[in-house]
Amino acid sequence: MKLVLASGNQGKLNELKALLSKQPVEIYSMSDFNNIKEAQETGKTFAENAIIKAQNVADSTGYLSLADDSGLEVDALDGAPGVYSARYAGENACDQDNNNKLLRSLKDIPYKQRTARFKCVIAIAYPDTPPVTFTGTCEGYILREPKGDRGFGYDPLFYHPDMGKTFGELYQEEKSSISHRGKALEKLVANFQDVMSLMEG
């Protein structure tokens, strides 16, 4: 069976191929197809956006498709930046712009109330079949200043208590073992045969 990743990101493609290497599936990137239009991420939740992206590719190609959507939820900000994580400081904002806005928004919030989580939702879609989702979360706190220069996005501000470091201080292997995306992918791998049966049925 063919599975199309609803992304042109080579890193995500390699990761997915490695995780599903023992499964009877050929994995492609949406870059391998010419007829796929960019999906409009109009969802109010990570799950809605992941489903929109996966369904768009499934309907365009006729194949099983996988997409993910993820971001940061800060409790003191009622779950913001949420689905706007990548553009929190504006449409063309860079990581530093978003981080600076987050720090300004939490300026007067004490550490104990700076709880936050990274959330990732993976959606699998197939034409004329209800989509299936898997969710992974990683809990932590937002620091008052960035630490570490690894990772991307909010990683230097996101402190993981069990690791005693920010995501910006962790090596990729360490981060993958505890990250929201890693947890969602684990659930996908554990349930992949069931999902295949459901979609093929």
Curated annotation (Swiss-Prot):
Keyword ATP-binding part of the UniProt annotation: no
Family annotation (CDD domains): HAM1
Cofactor: how and how many bound: Binds 1 Mg(2+) ion per subunit.
GO cellular component, one term: cytosol
Gene Ontology molecular function: dITP diphosphatase activity; ITP diphosphatase activity; metal ion binding; nucleotide binding; ribonucleoside triphosphate phosphatase activity; XTP diphosphatase activity
Domain of life: Bacteria
Cofactor: Mg(2+)
Assigned keywords, A-Z: Hydrolase, Magnesium, Metal-binding, Nucleotide metabolism, Nucleotide-binding
Entry-linked InterPro entries: dITP/XTP_pyrophosphatase, ITPase-like_fam, RdgB/HAM1
A Pfam family hit: Ham1p_like
Residues that bind Mg(2+): 69
EC number: 3.6.1.66
Active site: 69
Reactions listed under catalytic activity: XTP + H2O = XMP + diphosphate + H(+); dITP + H2O = dIMP + diphosphate + H(+); ITP + H2O = IMP + diphosphate + H(+)
One BP annotation, GO: purine nucleoside triphosphate catabolic process
Functional description taken from the UniProt entry: Pyrophosphatase that catalyzes the hydrolysis of nucleoside triphosphates to their monophosphate derivatives, with a high preference for the non-canonical purine nucleotides XTP (xanthosine triphosphate), dITP (deoxyinosine triphosphate) and ITP. Seems to function as a house-cleaning enzyme that removes non-canonical purine nucleotides from the nucleotide pool, thus preventing their incorporation into DNA/RNA and avoiding chromosomal lesions.
Assembly with partners or alone: Homodimer.
Name the UniProt record assigns to this protein: dITP/XTP pyrophosphatase
Species of origin: Natranaerobius thermophilus (strain ATCC BAA-1301 / DSM 18059 / JW/NM-WN-LF)
Taxonomic placement: Bacteria, Bacillati, Bacillota, Clostridia, Natranaerobiales
